[in-house]
């Protein structure tokens, strides 16, 4: 079928046959079982569980944490699959059959699919295996039968390699694209032996970051594959470094032998790195090779360049990432990572084409970022130097990779700020080395570390060319407490450190000033106007980020940049349509997610949802994208936290927008009111400009006269009423009372007087019984209006009183009592009273008072009965009324006789009488003339012999507002005193004219609180309802049911009974219905609600109307009281049916975590060995009587309390040191038991109790439904739908409860077995609850001891190095001193010695103390720096000694400050000079 292969292929085939015969690769005929891990580790199903079925054939490099491979398929081909059975490979081969051996595989030779399908499947297999280029090329030349055998074996050993699914996909793709597929396969898989196509090298993707980098591009290693779009990404996996040689190792050795890879060459080192066989010694050799950088023979390139071309840099980053994932590292791993970083530093120092190596450096940056928190200070310094070198390349992709790596580090540590883990380690190092005992030896390392770290910080900030980005990253640094670090670094007093801090603060101040200026410009300028032509060119594609635009990452939102972009030519706008760009980006991986997002948005737009719902969803998506692109680094890359924070910020923004919307509406309303006020003001100003001022003054004066007349009438009425009371005797017959409304005395009053005067005493009917009591009640209570009065145009007295200006009441004349002459009759029909009834008729009872009169001001007192037509005549007119005074102005004609005087007013009205309206008979034009006549009459006839009343001495005007009251001793009888002779009216008028009373009203005003009382109408409309519930329970009803406040009691009760979705979804309401207070009824409450209750079983009606009850009582009655025979069962069942799913998921999650912890503890042999080491060392230390075969877990808590003889190291530190130095493989138990960290919030006892509670609830509710209170439907309310609502959920709950109890039983059994395995008592509740906690505490303390030991050893190693350098320097000086036998210069004379001393003193005096501008700079920039840390995060110190160290630092700072104030440096120099002078003089003596 195929032409014979070339010679090179036959040589390789021979090697394959040898491997077959050695049973190492292909011969499975004699094996009864599938390959074991020892023989074929890459196909071990157990290893596939960790490595997701992918092997690095030939490279033994572990990828336990790497994601599974992506077997990309053509979705279009799958969707276009036809239904014909002949199109599927399954008609020839059934992949479900197990392939147990090679013999079984040979039985399927006759079931091979077409050659094209096999070739495509074999390409898929090669895409998940890593072979050298020549091996891949040779394997492609194998026959179809051989390829099929390898495919069957892979299907058997790798459960992720689903041959059936892949066959169907390949078949569909082949049939739908037959022509293109055949042409493509002819070019790639040609069988021609005459001309071999040159292999095409294509980058192979290696997922190296596990979960941290699963969304990023992967590093590349050169691999020979055909350029097929279906080729998936590849992963690197370890084949192991121990055991028998695997298939891949044998194949790699054979290929290396044929290719003659020379030992020590760059390719050889790369192959060793990828095979995970690079030892520490090899790392040192590699570092030496990179330092020497010799030219490679026969290549013309340097050794470093050859290593780079072989993708050694990427391979080193993969190994470094693998080491970084370990929590506990051995000393060899610490040394190896340090050497790898040194190698990467040498590689980055090599000059080469930076654009081609940019992708490789991305993964180098991500691997290096995790070492910024390494326990070793030397490693951190070196890593920071390499990162600074990479940042100096000023590539935005590297900058973004560094931020992504820091975000992954943040997520791993569980911090809240992206730079927090890094700067926390930085700050701890500063605090530790600042107080180190060997301060002189460690200070240089600290200064170097601080300087290079500050350079890196400034470089990362400087990489942001956008102001917005710089502000954002500075805020992140500020939240990570960088200003506190600056304060600590300032105490070191190093010039380099101060310069870097100065640089950071100076640039921060400049950015702050630029931000403030830009904000002012944006607030003052309007948005630029976009031309219509350019607006048409803006399409959706202009807002889609392309891969090229991703490298920029700088999107400044400043207005000037927007104007620059819009001011460009039209050619700058991309005219391609969105779909065109989307189609071009189909093959680009980064656009796949973009395409998916946009397709979902289009699907949402085309859905049947309403426009409002679509708009809300688009707003949420937009807010989330904005948060992810701009601010997600603050909280890391966790999807749940990003979503939660996005939704929270959106809700805050919406609430803020709602408040702003209300404020805008309110401002608009106030603006309209302001415009109306301005218009009114303009009208008033126009009136003032005209010549109407005099007219206004005259009108005001007339108003004053009218008001004065009204006051005079009030006084006159008061006097007449008092006189009538004096003339009445106790035996007189009571007069009938007729109530008068608030109109006062108008035309109707005059008409009544006319009728009264013309009636005779014989026509009066007898006085009705009870009239005296009625008269008293009329004066105090409401007023009834007779039918003769017309109230159509009536106004309350308060309106007239308010409309009367006080200032106008100054010169009003008083109304003098006189007899009115006859007047012509009036023809006014309204004023005419009704004719009197028959002479025998009796006065009718007063009609009911109208509503509008009840709510008005206090009415005037009722007039006597002579106003009624059938009332008795009044008493004779007093003598002082009969006078010869001039007649008053003519009255209306209907008054023909002299009217009788009105009755006096009651005493309570004379104090503050409300003024009645002006009589209708008085016209404004005649007021002045009438007042003049009254004044003249008043002067001609003074009053004598009459005792003054209160109405005489009270001023004619009363204050509008209440004044402070005078407290004096009143005289009731002033007949024989001077008070009776005073002219009160003259004095009062004079006070009014001079404005004294107005001034008194302003000066002595009293502040009174307005009490708003309910009117009688309101009390009738809202009758008081009854309430029997306690106040707390009523409040609980209002709080828990506040969302249904708009519903009536009947609708709410029906909603509850019908199990409305609003009730079911509100769990707080369901929990409230299960409150004991709603079920337990007191005796008094039972008796009070019994008359209002009904029973749904008997259908009886309530004795009283339930509407009399308050809202809470009515709801309680209808639900809790009337349904009390099954309300408890109903509420419990309803709540459980709505919450059991959530509880079930939560309990199953906790049980799964416990299962994982059980499995991890039982499988961790490293933990058992560490415990064995502890027991062995402890038995060695103990006497014979304390020898132990084992120990309980409580012993682990006491390891940190035993210290060595110097109290510098605990027993736990020593155990960690033993494990790390002698048993480094056992240190992996920390990573093996990482799942225990999720158990700290889970209590085993509480978990079992919750599971039992759920089982008990299911049982009780089921019993209620089957034979309990919910079983009989007749006992339920007719509208109650509880049975239909909970029947289906309870059936599902029973099944889930059975699964939960089974899982609990299995988990409890495994836990009991595990506790017994570790020597604990499963029946002890305390031991059961603290079982996992003991391991968690031990692991935490062990990790802490590991870090402390590493740092202590590094310090000791640094100390030894410096000590050796110092000793060598001293020895060298001694040796030079011995060799040079020259005598020392001796000062012979005292003059020379004194000259030396004087010179020394001059130098000391001339030296000035070192000063810095730190304080001045800090004050100048404090405002700018506070801008970047407006909301600093209070970060808890990781070490318990930090607070003590801070206290020491503050005390030392205070001491230094005190010393600086008392002893300046110049004085210290003088003291030292004096001491030296004293010593020299003593030597001379």
From Swiss-Prot:
SUPFAM superfamilies given in the database record: ARM repeat, Formin homology 2 domain (FH2 domain)
Keywords linked to the UniProt accession: Cell cycle, Cell division, Coiled coil
Keyword Cell cycle: yes
Disrupted-gene phenotype: Lead to a cell separation defect.
Disordered: annotated span: 65-88, 226-248, 549-575, 746-874, 1447-1471
Chief localization: other
FH2 domain location: 953-1368
GO molecular function, a single term: small GTPase binding
Any Pfam family: FH2
Bias kind Polar residues: ranges: 231-248
Cystine crosslinks: none
Keyword Signal carried by entry: no
Domain named GBD/FH3: residues: 110-636
Function description: May organize microtubules by mediating spindle positioning and movement in the budding process. Required for cytokinesis and the maintenance of polarized hyphal growth.
Record's subunit section: Interacts with IQG1.
Name of this chain's protein: Formin BNR1
Protein's organism: Candida albicans (strain SC5314 / ATCC MYA-2876) (Yeast)
Gene that encodes the chain: BNR1
């Amino acid at each position: 079928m195929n032409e014979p292969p070339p010679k090179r292929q036959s040589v390789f085939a021979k090697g394959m046959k040898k491997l077959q015969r050695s049973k190492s690769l292909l011969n499975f005929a004699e094996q009864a079982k599938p390959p074991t891990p020892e023989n074929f580790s890459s196909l071990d199903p157990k290893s596939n569980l960790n490595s997701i079925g992918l092997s690095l054939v030939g490279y033994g490099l572990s990828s336990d944490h790497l994601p599974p491979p992506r077997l990309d398929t053509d979705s279009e081909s799958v969707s276009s699959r036809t239904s014909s059975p002949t199109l599927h490979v399954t008609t020839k081969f059934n992949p479900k059959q197990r392939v147990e051996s090679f013999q079984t595989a040979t039985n399927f030779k006759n079931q091979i699919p077409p050659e094209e399908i096999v070739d495509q499947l074999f390409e898929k297999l090669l895409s998940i295996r890593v072979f050298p280029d020549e091996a891949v090329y040779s394997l492609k030349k194998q026959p179809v039968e051989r390829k099929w055998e390898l495919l069957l074996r892979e299907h058997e050993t790798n459960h992720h390699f689903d041959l059936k699914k892949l066959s169907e996909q390949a078949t569909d793709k082949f049939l739908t694209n037959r022509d293109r597929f055949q042409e493509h396969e002819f070019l790639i898989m040609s069988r021609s032996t005459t001309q071999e196509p040159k292999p095409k090298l294509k980058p192979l993707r290696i997922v190296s970051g596990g979960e941290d980098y699963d969304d990023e591009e992967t590093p590349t290693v050169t691999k020979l594959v055909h350029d097929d779009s279906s080729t998936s990404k590849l992963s690197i996996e370890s084949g192991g470094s121990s055991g028998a040689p695997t298939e891949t190792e044998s194949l790699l050795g054979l290929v290396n032998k044929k290719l003659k890879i020379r030992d020590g060459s760059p390719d050889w080192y790369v192959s060793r790195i990828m095979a995970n066989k690079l030892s520490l010694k090899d790392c040192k050799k590699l570092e030496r090779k990179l330092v020497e950088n010799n030219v490679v023979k026969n290549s013309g390139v340097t050794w470093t360049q050859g290593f780079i071309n072989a993708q050694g840099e990427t391979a080193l980053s993969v190994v470094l990432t693998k080491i970084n994932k370990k929590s506990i590292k051995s000393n060899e791993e610490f040394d190896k990572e340090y050497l790898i970083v040194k190698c990467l530093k040498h590689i980055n120092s090599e000059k080469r084409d930076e654009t081609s190596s940019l992708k490789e450096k991305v993964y180098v940056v991500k691997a290096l970022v995790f070492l910024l928190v390494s326990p070793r200070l030397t490693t951190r310094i070196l890593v920071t130097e390499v990162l600074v070198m990479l940042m100096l390349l000023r590539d935005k992709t590297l900058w973004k990779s560094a931020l992504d790596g820091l975000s992954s580090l943040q997520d791993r540590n569980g911090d809240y700020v992206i730079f927090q883990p890094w700067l926390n380690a930085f700050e701890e190092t500063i605090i530790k080395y600042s107080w180190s005992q060997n301060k002189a030896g460690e200070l240089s390392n600290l200064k170097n570390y601080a300087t290079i770290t500050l350079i890196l910080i400034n470089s990362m900030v400087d990489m942001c060319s956008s102001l917005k980005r710089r502000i954002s990253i500075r805020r992140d640094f500020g939240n990570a407490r960088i200003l506190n670090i600056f304060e600590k670094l300032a105490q070191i007093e190093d010039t380099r450190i101060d310069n870097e801090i100065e640089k950071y603060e100076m640039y921060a101040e400049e950015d702050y000033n630029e931000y403030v200026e830009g904000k002012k410009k944006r607030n003052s300028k309007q948005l630029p106007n976009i031309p219509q032509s350019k607006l048409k060119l803006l399409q959706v594609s202009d807002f889609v980020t392309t891969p090229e635009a991703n490298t920029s990452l700088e999107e400044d939102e400043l207005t000037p940049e927007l104007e620059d972009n819009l001011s460009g030519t039209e050619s700058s706008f991309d005219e391609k349509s969105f779909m065109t760009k989307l189609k071009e980006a189909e093959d680009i991986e980064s656009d796949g997610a973009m395409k998916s997002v946009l397709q979902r948005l289009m699907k949402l737009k085309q859905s049947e949802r309403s426009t409002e719902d679509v708009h809300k969803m688009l707003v949420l998506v937009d807010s989330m994208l904005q948060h992810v692109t701009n601010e997600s680094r603050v909280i890391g890359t966790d999807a749940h936290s990003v979503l939660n924070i996005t939704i929270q910020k959106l809700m805050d923004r919406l609430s803020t927008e709602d408040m702003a919307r209300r404020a805008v509406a309110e401002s608009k309303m106030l603006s309209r009111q302001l415009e109306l006020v301005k218009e009114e003001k303009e009208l008033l100003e126009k009136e003032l400009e005209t010549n109407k001022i005099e007219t206004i003054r005259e009108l005001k004066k007339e108003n004053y006269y009218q008001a004065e007349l009204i006051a005079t009438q009030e006084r006159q009425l008061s006097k007449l009423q008092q006189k009538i009371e004096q003339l009445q005797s106790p035996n007189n017959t009571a007069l009938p009372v007729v109530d008068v409304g608030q109109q006062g005395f108008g035309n109707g009053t005059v008409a009544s007087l006319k009728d009264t005067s013309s009636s005779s005493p014989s026509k009066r009917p007898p006085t009705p019984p009870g009239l005296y009591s009625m008269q008293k009640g009329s004066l105090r209570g409401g007023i009834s209006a007779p039918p003769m009065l017309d109230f159509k145009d009536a106004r309350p007295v308060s309106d007239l009183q308010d409309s009367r200006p006080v200032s106008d009441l100054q010169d009003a004349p008083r109304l003098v009592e006189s007899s009115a002459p006859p007047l012509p009759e009036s023809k006014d029909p309204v004023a005419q009273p009704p004719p009197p009834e028959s002479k025998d008729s009796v006065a009718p009872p007063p009609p009911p008072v109208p509503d509008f009169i009840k709510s008005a001001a206090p009415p005037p007192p009722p007039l006597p009965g002579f106003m009624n037509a059938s009332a008795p005549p009044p008493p004779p007119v007093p003598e002082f009324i009969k006078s010869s005074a001039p007649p008053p102005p003519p009255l209306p004609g209907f008054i023909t006789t002299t009217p009788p005087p009105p009755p006096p007013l009651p005493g309570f009205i004379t104090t503050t009488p409300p003024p009645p309206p002006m009589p209708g008979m008085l016209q404004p034009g005649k007021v002045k003339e009438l007042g003049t006549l009254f004044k003249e009459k008043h002067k001609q006839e003074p009053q004598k012999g009459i005792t003054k009343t209160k109405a005489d001495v009270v001023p004619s005007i009363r204050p509008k507002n209440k004044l402070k009251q005078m407290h004096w001793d009143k005289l009731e009888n002033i007949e024989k005193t001077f008070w009776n002779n005073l002219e009160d009216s003259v004095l009062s008028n004079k006070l009014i004219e001079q404005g004294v009373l107005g001034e008194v009203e302003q000066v002595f005003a009293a502040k009174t609180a307005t009490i708003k009382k309910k009117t009688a109408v309101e009390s009738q409309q809202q009758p008081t309802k009854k309430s029997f519930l306690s106040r707390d329970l009523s409040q609980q009803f209002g709080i828990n049911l506040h969302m249904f406040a708009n519903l009536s009691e009947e609708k709410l009760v029906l909603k509850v009974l019908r199990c409305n979705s609003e009730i079911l979804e509100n769990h707080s309401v369901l929990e409230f219905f299960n409150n004991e207070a709603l079920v337990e009824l007191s005796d008094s409450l039972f008796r009070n609600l019994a008359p209002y209750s009904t029973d749904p079983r008997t259908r009886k009606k309530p004795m009283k109307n339930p509407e009399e009850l308050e809202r809470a009582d009515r709801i309680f009655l209808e639900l809790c009281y009337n349904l009390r025979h099954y309300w408890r069962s109903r509420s419990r069942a309803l709540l459980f049916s709505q919450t059991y799913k959530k509880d079930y998921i939560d309990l199953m999650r906790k049980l799964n975590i416990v299962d994982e912890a059980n499995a991890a503890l039982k499988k961790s042999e490293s933990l058992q060995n560490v415990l064995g080491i502890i027991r062995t060392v402890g038995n060695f230390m103990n006497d014979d009587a304390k020898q132990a075969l084992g120990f309980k877990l409580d012993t682990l808590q006491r390891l940190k309390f035993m210290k060595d003889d110097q109290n510098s190291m605990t027993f736990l530190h020593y155990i960690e040191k033993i494990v790390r130095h002698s048993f480094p493989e056992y240190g992996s138990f920390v990573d093996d038991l990482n799942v225990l960290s999720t158990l700290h919030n889970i209590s085993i006892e509480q978990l079992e109790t919750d599971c039992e509670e759920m089982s008990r609830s299911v049982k009780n509710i089921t019993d209620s439904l089957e034979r309990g209170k919910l079983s009989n439907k007749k006992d339920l309310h007719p509208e109650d739908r509880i049975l239909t609502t909970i029947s289906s959920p309870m059936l599902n709950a029973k099944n889930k409860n059975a699964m939960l109890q089974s899982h609990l039983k299995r988990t409890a059994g495994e836990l009991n077995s595990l506790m017994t395995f570790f020597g604990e008592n499963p029946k002890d509740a305390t031991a059961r609850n603290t079982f996992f906690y003991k391991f968690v505490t031990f692991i935490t303390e062990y990790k802490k001891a590991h870090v402390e030991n590493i740092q202590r050893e590094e310090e000791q190693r640094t100390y030894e190095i410096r000590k050796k350098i110092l000793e060598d320097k001293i020895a060298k000086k001694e040796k030079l001193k011995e060799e040079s036998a020259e005598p020392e210069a001796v000062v012979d004379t005292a003059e020379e010695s004194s000259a030396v001393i004087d010179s020394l003193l001059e130098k000391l005096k001339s030296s000035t103390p070192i000063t810095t501008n730190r304080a001045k700079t800090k004050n100048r920039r404090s405002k700018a720096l506070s801008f970047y840390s407006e909301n600093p995060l209070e970060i808890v110190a990781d070490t318990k000694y930090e607070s003590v160290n801070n206290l020491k630092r503050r005390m030392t700072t205070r001491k230094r400050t005190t010393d600086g104030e008392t002893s300046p440096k110049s004085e210290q120099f003088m003291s030292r000079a004096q001491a030296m002078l004293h010593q020299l003089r003593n030597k001379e003596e």
